[in-house]
UniProtKB/Swiss-Prot annotation, chain B:
It is a single-pass membrane protein. It is found in: Mitochondrion; Mitochondrion inner membrane. It comes from the Eukaryota. Component of the ATP synthase complex composed at least of ATP5F1A/subunit alpha, ATP5F1B/subunit beta, ATP5MC1/subunit c (homooctomer), MT-ATP6/subunit a, MT-ATP8/subunit 8, ATP5ME/subunit e, ATP5MF/subunit f, ATP5MG/subunit g, ATP5MK/subunit k, ATP5MJ/subunit j, ATP5F1C/subunit gamma, ATP5F1D/subunit delta, ATP5F1E/subunit epsilon, ATP5PF/subunit F6, ATP5PB/subunit b, ATP5PD/subunit d, ATP5PO/subunit OSCP. It comes from Bos taurus. InterPro entries: F1F0-ATPsyn_F_prd (IPR019344). The modification Phosphoserine is found at S3. GO terms for cellular component: mitochondrial inner membrane; mitochondrion; proton-transporting ATP synthase complex. This is ATP synthase F(0) complex subunit f, mitochondrial.
């Protein structure tokens, strides 16, 4: 156990130079580009997966919304790969840093909302009032809808940070508990180890799901606004 | 000692041990030279292990293993306090 449980979440710096830049850029190495029609297995698999995801996610948008395909696909690839790489031992996950998630969430949300306000002003303003509300409630409801609009980027960022950080912390804690229990009672250690296995499976799922959820929500905000 | 092939164009495995320092100093250390070295290295690995007809999981796993190893080296300073030793 670390003297401070959170030392694994500090930004990696080597001799004062930010190593975190290299770590953030590393997943791009794992997605090679190719201009050929028939590629090697690695590239074919990735292209197939990307086609599957893009069809599923961008089919709900009109032609204006589909101009965002590149952005949303890069987003889901980045978050998914960064989260999955963070499950390797000793690695650093950039998505545990709230600063980075805010940096992803706020511009994307703001872009979607501002597009909506510029192009369909009436419809965007109409979102602030659900249909069929009784007249006395209108002022309060507008305030509530405004707050819920402005909380969207915060929720996006904090959701991703909290999920990934919590998962990593749980793995650290339960792993440490298994190790400590080994000398005390082997059966309990085995039970804890099984819990660790299940947790790791969960974390793999969470890594991918969080990427999906983030991108899906941005896409939803986009759909509302195009 | 005049070699048949000039020192600059020899590959590393053909350089004699005494000529090694001068060979290293003759390499291109400009930014574009270093970028070229990284690019050459990347494509060498890619074309040998990934860009083949029947690529296997080994191509990806070796990269991930190297990544894990580098991260271990990076965090060794904190990790060495967690070894099972009587005196740290």
């Amino acid at each position: 156990m670390n003297e401070n449980l959170f030392t694994s979440f500090t930004t990696p710096v080597i001799l004062g130079l930010p190593l975190v830049t290299l770590i953030v850029l590393f997943p791009s190495l794992l997605f090679p580009t190719s201009n050929r029609l028939v590629n090697n297995r690695f590239v074919t698999l990735q292209q197939w997966m990307l086609q599957l995801v893009s069809k599923q996610m961008m089919s709900i948008h009109n032609s204006k919304g589909q101009t965002w395909t590149l952005m949303l696909m890069s987003l889901i690839l980045f978050i998914g790969s960064t989260n999955l790489l963070g499950l390797l031992p000793h690695s650093f996950t950039p998505t545990t840093q709230l600063s980075m998630n805010l940096g992803m969430a706020i511009p994307l949300w703001a872009g979607a909302v501002i597009t909506g306000f510029r192009n369909k002003t009436k419809a965007s303003l109409a979102h602030f009032l659900p249909q069929g509300t009784p007249t006395p409630l209108i002022p309060m409801l507008v305030i509530i809808e405004t707050i819920s609009l402005f909380i969207q980027p915060m929720a996006l960022a904090v959701r991703l940070t909290a999920n990934i950080t919590a998962g990593h912390l749980l793995i650290h804690l339960i792993g440490g508990a298994t190790l400590a229990l080994m000398s005390i009672s082997t059966t309990t250690a085995l039970i804890t180890f099984t819990i660790l296995i299940l947790l790791t499976i969960l974390e793999f799922a969470v890594a991918m799901i969080q990427a999906y959820v983030f991108t899906l929500l941005v896409s939803l905000y986009l759909h509302d606004n195009t | 000692m005049a070699s048949v092939v000039p020192l600059k164009e020899k590959k590393l495995l053909e350089v004699k041990l005494g000529e090694l320092p001068s060979w290293i100093l003759m390499r291109d250390f400009t930014p574009s030279g270093i970028a070229g070295a990284f690019q050459r290295g990347y494509y060498r690995y890619y074309n040998k292990y990934v860009n083949v007809k029947k690529g296997s999981i080994a191509g990806l796993s070796m990269v991930l293993a190297a990544y894990v190893f580098l991260n271990y080296c990076r965090s060794y300073k904190e990790l060495k306090h967690e070894r099972l030793r009587k005196y740290h």
